[in-house]
Amino acid sequence: MEGWSQVALVPLKNSNNNSNSNSSSNNSSNGVLVQDPISTVTTTVFDSVQNLVWCGDTSGYVRSLSSVKTSPYSIQLYPYTKFRTNTLNQPIIQILSHREGVLSLLNDQLSIYNRRGVPRNAVNSMSFKESNGRELFKDLKTMSFNCNSFNEIVVGTELDLIKVDMNKSNLVQQFNHTGKVAMVKEAPKLLALASSTGSLELFDPTSNSSIKTFSAHNGYMSDMDIKGNYIATCGNSIRPKRYHYHQAPEYTADPLVNIFDIRTMKAVAPVAFPAGVSSVRFHPKLPNILIVTSAYGLIEFVDIFDQTNVSVYHADMSAATPPLPPAGSSAAQQQKQQQQQQQQPHLSGLEISENGDFFMFNDGFSNLHLWSITNSGTLSKNFVNFPQEIERPDIVNGPSGVLGGGSGSGDGAFIDIDADVPLSVVGMPYYKELLLSNWPNDLKFVKEKARLPEPIDPDLLSIFEKQQQQKISQTPKWIPYDSLKYGTCNIPEYYSLTSQKDTQIPKFLSEKNGGQKQRQKSIQALEDSIFQCQNDEKIPNCYSRLQIQYSKFGVKDFDFAFYNRTQEYCGLENHSDNSYINSLLQLYRFQSVFYNKVVHSLSNEWLPNDEATIETNPEGSSILNELAYLFDMMFKAKSRNVKTYNFSQVMNHDKQAAKLINLNELMNLNSHEVRELIIAFNNYLLTRLSMDFRNQFNFNFDLTELAYEIEVRGRGHSCPIYDKQMGAMFSLELITPPHNMMSKMSILVNPNTQQDQQQQQQQQQQQQQQQQPTNLANIRKNLNILTYLEYSMNQYKTIPCTQHQHFHPHTLEIRTSITKLPPVLVLNVNLTNEEFRIINSLKQWLVPDLYAVRATNNGSNRGYSFKPSMPVSGDFKKYQLLGYVCEISHQVDTSRTGGHNLVSFVKIKDEWMFFNDYLVIPIPEEEVFNLTYSWKKPVIVIYQEVDKMDKVEPFRHITHFQGNDSILYRDHFAGPIRELYQREYTLLTREKEAPQPGTLVAIDAEFVTLKPEQLEISYNGQKKLVKPKELSLARVSVLRGGREGINSNITGNNNDDNNNISGMIIDDPLFGEAFIDDYIVHKSHIYDYTTNFSGIEPNDLDIHKSSKNLVTLQTAYRKLWLLLNLGVIFVGHGLYTDFRTINLQVPEEQIRDTADFYYKSSFKRQLSLKFLAYVMLKERVQKGNHDSIEDARTALLLYKKYVELNQKSTNEFEKMLNFVYEEGNRLKYRVPEL
């Protein structure tokens, strides 16, 4: 439902007949008329017969507005009739459109008027002869037509439910119902009643009994609508009493629209609307579309069967402002107007026209907002499909003597142009625009100043003529529009939620204000809707391509935790290069043997630093090392997100991976190219790991290695050709068997009982007798991955022999078989789209377990056969499905680029987990094995060998490092060593200063910018950060800081994890002395050195031009990684950004961040290191360029000061922090200049 916009804003001016009528309405500051608070609009409705809009107000007036289409693109509403329904100034409660007129409901009266304002009938308590009727007809609340009747009106009162026949208005019937009826609506054969307590009751007027009652809302029901067999309700809930028991109840709008099905008498899935629902309406022509609004102007069109199909608009509620009290008003009127000035405009009275082309609402100040669809180019002028003509008043001529001016008399008198008669005596229709006669006095219409129409562009004429010359059968619907030549089109702003399907809660942490309870409700709403889809073509939300959003606070403000439903498994960010590898890395991360071998390779040291290596590998690392670091960070991160930047950078500089680089998140690839890319990376990764193990540690990495044998034999008696070759590969390419072999192979791989086999053989014989081809549907239940695996591992084909063909024709047999299976079986499913359709048609292609049985032929091994169940005898291996990488096609046409992404399913501790970049959620097993969707294609499948107890090797995580840590105690420079360079650090000594758990070290890092940030600038100048700037580590300094001890008198500030553990023990004479000060070598282009903040000068990081001793990135990273795994505690200022850019996942218990300690949440401002040093330490730092050693030492001293203040008393630091912020307010948080 795109293309809606506001087409008219009508101020409903009050015109009470009193002495103050001239001052009963005012103009607001923006020109919109605002209603006198004495009389405001209470109800609105579209007419069901004519193009009219009806309004009722608090003074008992009913007025109508007629639509006039002023142009193809605009519409106006003009007053048509206005009449008063009573003399007691009772407010109009409700209006209904009737075929004979309009019905209006007051507190004790029901009346009907025709559309010209002439009364037809009125029913009140005095209309009934019986005293019972007089007692019933009071305190009226709501009304509706009875089921399938336009003459019978059902009215809800304070205590009863009654029925009035307008043809027999002196009789009233009481239904068998007690209790207050707040709203009543007609449904097919039933009445829907809303009570004051929030319940929904279905009442049968024929049997005069209640059918069903639903508990819809906790408080009261604010709106209700019915379409077909569905009822939609919205309401409010009672807030808990916060102060005392007798407190008046407070209500809050419910964030859900409840939907009830009349046929099943059950509630169906509600519609989420976090802004709070105030009104709800079904679309009259599209019963699946629901229009939901909030009191603050948010409008949403949502499909109740597919709630991801949403269109969102926002009404401009700022157009109405309450008027100032008019001069001469009474004190009561002025008091009411002053109360209204304090109120905010709110959306109410939502109504939609019968044809569904318009809807309207009131803003609380009697301004009527009319909306319509404008994306078709023109507006509809009708509110109903076939409107009746509106009766217009007759035009009466003025007095003949006046109009005639002496030239005529009577009707049709003519006014001469020279007659001395003012034209104002004729009268004018109602108008709001400036008249043509309103021109300046000095304006003269002369030929020289006349403006001629713009000529038609010749390009458009030539296009039209060319189309005519081509003899097009019909006139084209449009001609190409050149926006560069003619400017932007007048197109309304477009709102869509397609790219952001997870909108149940705010994206940014700074936007949250609902607390933990609201967050839990939002997460539950997301979990309920994540797999909701009505057909196979609609892809659930969890498979969507995710996009990280950036606020003004950066990526730290993005709520990654919302997308992770676990406590121990991390997600991977997708805004780095080559992010398509995330799904495969998650899969290998949870294969324990693979993980253990890779991660524990870090126990040994491999740090190449020669110039030849740095020219091609500036990071001085390898795929093995970076994958090991990444796996360890993924474990330590728990449920926090992790970046793959370091791994991707090493991959980018590897020449063997040149064809695997992807920098735009697969947007330039189609479905088949995406699958080929991830399979190629899988082969590269396994091959590269094997090479790295062999080159670095002389170790054979055969975890996934399959041994194969190729045998070539001549079939002729005299053909001597025979050859046998052996080989190995790290993954197996699955091949689809030919159709004529599928039937036979499905029986061999998936044997049933002997009786079933005989039945299948009989069926095959019958098919062969009838000479019909093999029907794949008959064997579909037996086909699965084992069929493909059996065929792929045991290849057999024949080719003509070319060497001995002249003797007699014969062929050569070529047999390929797998002779050895690895512990981890990696299968590449590189099939075509047509072959995937076969998999989609199978009942269950993947199997959770498989058994590999050694096949024998005359005593010799002939490969393997695969069974879905345990063999009775023989040598076999059991494999269990670990998971698979899956390609998701978001486009029906898979040949189109973009719209494809990769996800993975992994079995962890007997539970299936789903990984989609940083989205991590548990997933049902049925969804994992369901491959019947055309958009879901398995690409890489991994099975792992298990023992008889279905166990695999346990994970061996690195919690306390015990390997080679010698890099901490020596220098390891890259390239030439500058002897003249003066070192500013002193290396650690292993005997006295070996890092231990609890050792304090101060750290600070400086970065340079490799790539600038990417911004999206809208037409109005607003900027949106699409991708942040790419930073790289340039310098890191680490200082000695003593040890941390336990002190029960110390309490942390704003960091509960640090309570009672903040004591410092300083026994090192080199306290505050640096032991690491590394400058990182860079070979790639540096966009910005940011010298003012980093202190890095140009050429400082160039291996040939730098005056400093440089190290590779892996050398610096390994030092920090060793400190982390040795259990040291890092002290610094703003460590979140440093560790995130370095890609180091440090547990919170190992971080002491002074930016968090010296932070007071009530001020919502973090203090800079420079300002804290000035106030707390009485020192001036960062006087020139930043120096990482100085910054780290300052943070260490600030932490020492924090500990000292907490040791004195619990309130000492709190007092000092208040003083710091007071100084900040006085100095504007800046250090005064000298």
Swiss-Prot record:
The protein, known as: PAN2-PAN3 deadenylation complex catalytic subunit PAN2
PANTHER family: DEADENYLATION COMPLEX CATALYTIC SUBUNIT PAN2 (PTHR15728), PAN2-PAN3 DEADENYLATION COMPLEX CATALYTIC SUBUNIT PAN2 (PTHR15728:SF0)
Function: Catalytic subunit of the poly(A)-nuclease (PAN) deadenylation complex, one of two cytoplasmic mRNA deadenylases involved in mRNA turnover. PAN specifically shortens poly(A) tails of RNA and the activity is stimulated by poly(A)-binding protein PAB1. PAN deadenylation is followed by rapid degradation of the shortened mRNA tails by the CCR4-NOT complex. Deadenylated mRNAs are then degraded by two alternative mechanisms, namely exosome-mediated 3'-5' exonucleolytic degradation, or deadenylation-dependent mRNA decaping and subsequent 5'-3' exonucleolytic degradation by XRN1.
Name of the top EC class for this enzyme: hydrolase
One cellular component (GO) term of this entry: PAN complex
Notes on how activity is controlled: Positively regulated by the regulatory subunit PAN3.
Co-factor: note: Binds 2 metal cations per subunit in the catalytic exonuclease domain.
Region listing for Linker, in residue ranges: 383-537
GO process annotations (BP): mRNA processing; nuclear-transcribed mRNA poly(A) tail shortening
Domain (Exonuclease): residue spans on this chain: 1072-1199
Domain notes: Contains a pseudo-UCH domain. This ubiquitin C-terminal hydrolase (UCH)-like or ubiquitin specific protease (USP)-like domain is predicted to be catalytically inactive because it lacks the active site catalytic triad characteristic of thiol proteases, with residues at the equivalent structural positions that are incompatible with catalysis, and it cannot bind ubiquitin. It functions as a structural scaffold for intra- and intermolecular interactions in the complex.
Localization of this protein: Cytoplasm
Residues given in the record as a divalent metal cation binding sites: D1004, E1006, D1138, D1191
Molecular function via GO: metal ion binding; nucleic acid binding; poly(A)-specific ribonuclease activity
Compositionally biased region (Low complexity): 14-30, 333-344, 754-772
Assembly behavior: Forms a heterotrimer with an asymmetric homodimer of the regulatory subunit PAN3 to form the poly(A)-nuclease (PAN) deadenylation complex.
A Pfam family recorded for this sequence: UCH_1
EC number: 3.1.13.4
Occurrences of domain USP (ranges): 538-946
